[in-house]
A protein has these predicted regions:
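Structural recognition of alpha-helix starts/caps
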Residues: 1-126
Length: 126
C-alpha cells in the first residue's frame, strides 16, 4: 500500500503536536508519605488521559481513597463507555495497610486525545 502525501501534509504529520512523548513525561508519578497516609499522585499532561479501570496494584487488594481527581465518562473507540481521568489523579492508602507488603507496584494505562494509546505501564512504588 502506497499513499501519496503532499509536502504540507508531511509537515503536519511530523509536527511537534504529533510527537509521541514517553509515558513518564505524560503521566508523571509522585509519591508522598507521612506517618498515617501514603499518597500516589499522577500529574497528567494536557491532551492526555488515564483509564480509571486500568489502575491496579500487584499483590495488594486493600481499599484506597481517591483524592483531588476529576473523573469523567468517555466514549472510547475500543472499550466503549469508560471512566477517564485528566490533569490530576491522586490516591491515598493508610500506612498501616502497607506494613505487611514487601513491595508495591501499580499499573496504569492512558492515551493521547490524538488517538495514541500507551501500553500498560508498571511503576514500582515501594
Amino acid at each position: 500500500l502506497v499513499t501519496a502525501v503532499n509536502s504540507s501534509d508531511k509537515k503536519e504529520f511530523f509536527s511537534a503536536k504529533n510527537e509521541i512523548l514517553p509515558a513518564e513525561e505524560v503521566f508523571e508519578v509522585k509519591v508522598l508519605n507521612n506517618s498515617e497516609t501514603f499518597s500516589i499522585r499522577w500529574d497528567i499532561r494536557e491532551g492526555y488521559y488515564m483509564y480509571l479501570d486500568s489502575i491496579k496494584f500487584q499483590d495488594y487488594e486493600k481499599p484506597y481513597r481517591i483524592l483531588n481527581s476529576e473523573i469523567s465518562s468517555y466514549e472510547d473507540e475500543y472499550f466503549g463507555k469508560t471512566k477517564v481521568i485528566k490533569k490530576i489523579f491522586e490516591i491515598e492508602i493508610k500506612t498501616e495497610d502497607l506494613m505487611a507488603v514487601d513491595g508495591l507496584v501499580v499499573q496504569y494505562q492512558g492515551c493521547s486525545e490524538q488517538g495514541f494509546c500507551y501500553p500498560v505501564k508498571k511503576h514500582k512504588i515501594l
